[in-house]
Swiss-Prot record, chains A, B:
Catalytic residues (UniProt): D93 (proton acceptor), D279 (nucleophile)
Any GO BP: tRNA-guanine transglycosylation
Cofactor (UniProt): Zn(2+)
Alphabetized NCBIfam families for the sequence: Q_tRNA_tgt, tgt_general
Protein name, entry field: Queuine tRNA-ribosyltransferase
Gene name of the record: tgt
Lineage summary: Bacteria, Pseudomonadati, Acidobacteriota, Terriglobia, Terriglobales
One GO CC term on file: cytosol
Assembly and interaction partners: Homodimer. Within each dimer, one monomer is responsible for RNA recognition and catalysis, while the other monomer binds to the replacement base PreQ1.
C-alpha cells in the first residue's frame, strides 16, 4: 500500500507556510481556498470551468448527500468523484455542523445527534460511527471527525462539556475509520489508498479550552487538524485571536484547516497566521446575491450606477468574466433575474478567491515580507 | 458602402437548400436553428459556450429589451453585440408577437399596438415606425417588419383584415427602416453596413390568404421572408401543409424563416421543405423543465429510473455534457433543484438541435436522398 496522504511545507514566511498535499486524487497547493459544492455541485458552475479556475480541491456536504441522493446511491455509483465527474481532490465535512444549523429538531446524546431531515421531516441519527460510514461511502479524499460545534455564546462549563464530548467522539471517529477505511469505493482502483481523517479542535471562545482541545486532539493523532466552532456569530477579532493562539499548538508538519472562513481579507489574514486550508460559502452565496469581490473593494452589481458602466467588473482580474463582459451587462443580467448572472458572478468571485490565495502562496515562496502579501482594500469591510 | 447582407444557395436536395448568409457580423450556414436569447442571454449559457456549440446566430426579443434595459441604454452601450459581448450574428423580432402573447391590456389600431408592460404596468405603443426605431437602436443584423400575428382560430374576414393590416405595416416598416437604417450603432465601424429587414407573410390558416400575403409581401421587396402566425395552437399537420404551399411562392434566392418552430423532427421536416432559418424556445425551455432531446428519443430526467443510470444522456452525442456526466448525476441535479441542472440540460439540448441542423445541411450538400436525412425517432412525439 502506497502513502494515502502526505503534506510537505515547502516555504515559510513568518508563521505563513506554502505547502503541498498529496491525496489519492492529486496534488493540492496550500494555502488553499476550497469552494463549497454542497450537493456535489458548486452551484451553477460546470466541472470543466472549476478545472479552468484552477480548483484543486472542493467540498461536499455529508448531511446533504446523505439525504439526497443517499450514501448507498453514491457508493453504488463509485463514490462522489465518479458521481460528479470530478477527478481532483474532495473533502467532506462530518455532517455535524449542518445538523446543528439546518435541523430544527435535533437532540444530542452521548451516542450522537438525532435530527429530522429539512427535506421531508424523516428521523435520522448521526454518530461518530455513522458519520464515518457515510463519509467512507461518499468517498472524499479528506474526511472529518464527527464533532459538536459549540453554539455561541456558551458558558465555560457548557463549552467544556461540549469539548469533552467532541474529544470522545474524535476517538470513536478514529476507531470507526480505522476499522472501515478499506471500504472506500475507490480503494482497489487507487492502489489500496484510503482517505485521510482530520481531527477537529473545539473549545469555544475560551483560550484554555482551545489549548486543551488542541493538545488532546493531537494526542489522539490525525494526519491533519481543523479548527472548528468559528463563524458562529462571534466577533471576528475574537476568531483571529483564538486562531493565532491555537495554531502554534498544532504540529508543523500537518495541514491546518480553518473551517467556514471567510472574507477575502480574512483568508489572507489566516494564511499569514499559518492556516493551510479554508472553505466558505461566501464567494458563491454572495455571487448569487450580486455581491462581488474585486481588487477595488466589493460592489453590489444591482446598483443603478453600473447600468451604463462599460468597464470590466475588476480591471485587475483576468478571469473570463472580467475579460469579456461589462458591468452594465452583468447589472442587466442581475436586474433581470437571469440565471447567467449567477453563473458569471460565481465564476468571478471564485476566481478572485483562488487568485488571492495563489498570490499569497507566491509571496510566501518568493520570501516577500508580509507587508507585500496582497492588500485587500477596506471597502470589503464596509461598503455594499 | 459594401454589401450589408447576402445569401447564397450552395446546394439543393429536392426542395431543401444548403446556403450561406453573410451579415455585418459574420457568416451563417443554413439551414440554421437559432437559439433564443430573450433579454440578450440564452438562459444560463455563457457566450463562450455558445461559440463552442457552434452558434452562428441567435435571437434577441425586442419587447423584452425595450422594457429592460431599454433601447437607448443599449444604443449608448454600442448595440446589443457589444452589450452582450457577442460578435456573431443576431436577429431581433419586431416585438409584435411578444406584445400579443405577453400583454394583458393591448389594443390594436391602424397606428399600432398600445399595451401595458408585464413588468410594471406602464403604457407603451409599438408601431411599425417605433418597432424599426427600437430594432435599429438595439442593432441586430437581421430585423423583422412589424406585423400582427393573427390569433388562432380566426374567421376568414378577420384573418383577411389582419393580413391587410400587416401588409400596410410592412410598407411602413420598410419606409421607416430605409429612412433610418444608417442610425444603427455600428454603422460607421462596420464600413457603413446596415441591417437587413425581413418581411413577414401572414394569412392565418387560409391557403389563399397565405398566397396573397406572400405575393404582396414579395412585391414590397425584402432581402428575406419569414412565415409568421404559426405555433399559435393550430394542428401541426396544418402548419406543415401551409408551409409546404407557401414556400414555392417565395423567391429562391432569399432566405426563408419559419418563426417559432419546433421539435427536432419538425426542424428537420421544415428544412426538407426549403426553410432556411428557424427559432424556438423549446430546446432551452424544455431543458429547464428537465425534458431532454436525444438520438434515442426524448426523456424526462427527473424520472426515478435514471437515479442509478451511469450512462451518458445520449450515447450518440458528443457534447461536453454527454462526454462527462452520467444520467444519474443529471437526475440528481434536477431533483435537487440545482442551477447546474439548467446549465447542463440547456447545453445538451442546444447541442442536439444544432447538431441535427448541421447533419441536415451535410446531407443536402452530399446530395444524399431525403430518406437519409437524420431520422428523429418517434418517442419525440409521444413519450415523456
Amino acid at each position: 500500500m502506497s502513502m494515502s496522504f502526505s503534506f510537505q511545507v515547502e516555504a515559510t514566511q513568518g508563521a505563513a507556510r506554502a505547502g503541498r498535499m498529496i491525496t489519492p486524487h492529486g496534488e493540492v497547493e496550500t494555502p488553499v481556498f476550497m469552494p463549497v459544492g454542497t450537493v456535489a455541485t458548486v452551484k451553477g458552475i460546470p466541472q470543466d470551468l472549476l478545472e479552468e479556475l484552477g480548483v484543486q480541491i472542493l467540498l461536499n456536504n455529508t448531511y446533504h448527500l446523505y439525504l439526497r441522493p443517499g450514501v448507498e446511491q453514491i457508493r453504488k455509483l463509485g463514490g462522489t468523484h465518479k458521481f460528479m465527474s470530478w477527478d481532483r481532490s474532495i473533502l467532506t465535512d462530518s455532517g455535524g455542523f449542518q445538523v446543528f444549523s439546518l435541523s430544527e429538531l435535533r437532540k444530542v446524546t452521548e451516542e450522537g445527534v438525532s435530527f429530522r431531515s429539512h427535506l421531508d421531516g424523516s428521523s435520522h441519527l448521526f454518530s461518530p460511527e455513522s458519520a464515518m460510514a457515510s463519509q467512507i461511502g461518499i468517498g472524499a479524499d479528506i474526511i472529518m471527525a464527527f464533532d459538536e460545534c459549540t453554539e455561541y455564546p456558551a458558558e465555560r462549563t457548557r463549552t467544556e462539556r461540549s469539548m469533552e464530548l467532541t474529544l470522545r467522539w474524535a476517538e470513536r471517529s478514529k476507531n470507526a475509520f480505522e476499522a472501515h477505511k478499506h471500504e472506500v469505493p475507490w480503494f482497489a482502483e487507487r492502489g489500496k489508498k484510503s482517505q485521510a481523517l482530520f481531527g477537529i479542535v473545539q473549545g469555544g471562545m475560551f483560550p484554555n479550552l482551545r489549548k486543551e482541545s488542541a493538545e488532546r486532539t493531537v494526542e489522539i493523532g490525525f494526519p491533519g487538524y481543523a479548527l472548528g466552532g468559528f463563524s458562529v456569530g462571534e466577533p471576528r477579532e475574537k476568531t483571529a485571536e483564538l486562531v493565532a493562539n491555537t495554531v502554534p499548538l498544532l504540529p508543523e508538519n500537518k495541514p491546518r484547516y480553518l473551517m467556514g472562513v471567510g472574507y477575502p481579507e480574512e483568508i489572507v489574514q489566516y494564511a499569514r497566521m499559518g492556516i493551510d486550508m479554508m472553505d466558505c460559502v461566501l464567494p458563491t452565496r454572495a455571487a448569487r446575491h450580486g455581491l462581488l469581490f474585486t481588487s477595488e473593494g466589493r460592489l453590489t452589481i444591482k446598483n443603478q450606477r453600473f447600468a451604463s458602466d462599460e468597464g470590466p467588473l475588476d480591471p485587475n482580474c483576468s478571469c473570463k468574466v472580467c475579460k469579456r463582459y461589462s458591468r452594465a451587462y452583468l447589472r442587466h443580467l442581475y436586474a433581470s433575474n437571469e440565471v447567467l448572472a449567477q453563473v458569471l458572478n460565481t465564476t468571478h468571485n471564485l476566481s478572485y478567491y483562488l487568485d488571492t490565495m495563489r498570490r499569497v502562496r507566491q509571496a510566501i515562496i518568493l520570501g516577500e515580507n508580509s507587508v507585500s502579501l496582497p492588500v485587500v482594500r477596506s471597502p470589503h469591510l464596509s461598503a455594499t
